[in-house]
Curated annotation (Swiss-Prot):
SUPFAM superfamilies membership: NAD kinase/diacylglycerol kinase-like
Primary location group: cytoplasm
Cellular component terms (Gene Ontology): cytoplasm
UniProt organism field: Gloeobacter violaceus (strain ATCC 29082 / PCC 7421)
HAMAP family assigned: NAD_kinase
Organism domain of life: Bacteria
Compartments where located: Cytoplasm
Enzyme Commission number(s) from the entry: 2.7.1.23
Job description of the protein: Involved in the regulation of the intracellular balance of NAD and NADP, and is a key enzyme in the biosynthesis of NADP. Catalyzes specifically the phosphorylation on 2'-hydroxyl of the adenosine moiety of NAD to yield NADP.
Keywords, comma-separated and alphabetical: ATP-binding, Cytoplasm, Kinase, NAD, NADP, Nucleotide-binding, Transferase
InterPro entries (alphabetical): ATP-NAD_kinase_N, ATP-NAD_kinase_PpnK-typ_C, NAD/diacylglycerol_kinase_sf, NADK
Name of protein: NAD kinase 2
MF-aspect GO terms: ATP binding; metal ion binding; NAD binding; NAD+ kinase activity
Amino acid sequence: MMALPKAGIIFNDIKPAAARAAAELTEKFQDAGYRVYQTTGWGGILGFPRPDSPVCHTPIDRLAAEGFDEAMPFAIVLGGDGTVLAAARQVAPFDIPLLTINTGHMGFLTEGYLNQIHPAIDTLLAGQYALEDRSMIEVRVFRDERLIWEALALNEAVLHKEPLSGICHFEVAIGRHNIVDIAADGVIVATPTGSTAYALSAGGPVITPDVQVLQLIPICPHSLAARGLVFADTESLVVHPPTNHQHLILSLDGNSGCYIWPGDQVRIRRARYRTRLIRLQPPEFFALLREKLGWGLPHIAKPLSVELP
């Protein structure tokens, strides 16, 4: 007897609307002959570090909940962008495509809204969709050449000082090129997907998702010569933290990650995994910039979370 196909649901259990939708979809998929596996976005949350416990994490390929594996053809994400980022971290090692439904605020990474969920699922089950691949980064922390922490990020990795501490001097090496010194409050290493997140707020450029690059953006640099840098994602990057600070904080996709001590190395490269997004309509990145961020609109206009003409 053949096993039933799998369907995954990852939802933000803090939001009642997402929890209700998860229950409705479970019944819908079961009626369609699927085995349904549920989990929350908490599985992809990296936790809150403490200086005396810097390795509070799970290895990259062990974040997924039971039932989420290569045999799962898709998973539904119910939440905002934070839930999507956490879900991507969980399922990327198994190449599971995600259909993302917004129950949050911005919804920059989501495909549809909650009031569109049932026709969206019908379209999905009919196989009428395309896949859009997004690159990720793999972040590893080494201490005395020993790996102590690792994680995936879809948006960015941020290494920054704690509040009320002085300016930092980061030594950064890209590929085999000379090490550069960056005097700043922190540095951001972002993917094209992350170019519309923290990197944008720090003065970085918007990069379309299909471009195979990474970007290095200083946070509040103390130099007129310090500018963001876009480079090929075939290059790896190593950040040496400053020696005049007891510790720094490394965070990924807005999550706490771990503390970085003097002498540690933060090594970042394009991940061998990817995030696969299910698209029910051909993606239109520039329309999304206009809708969500107000790109190209008159300065008196404000972006709305609705489709604009």
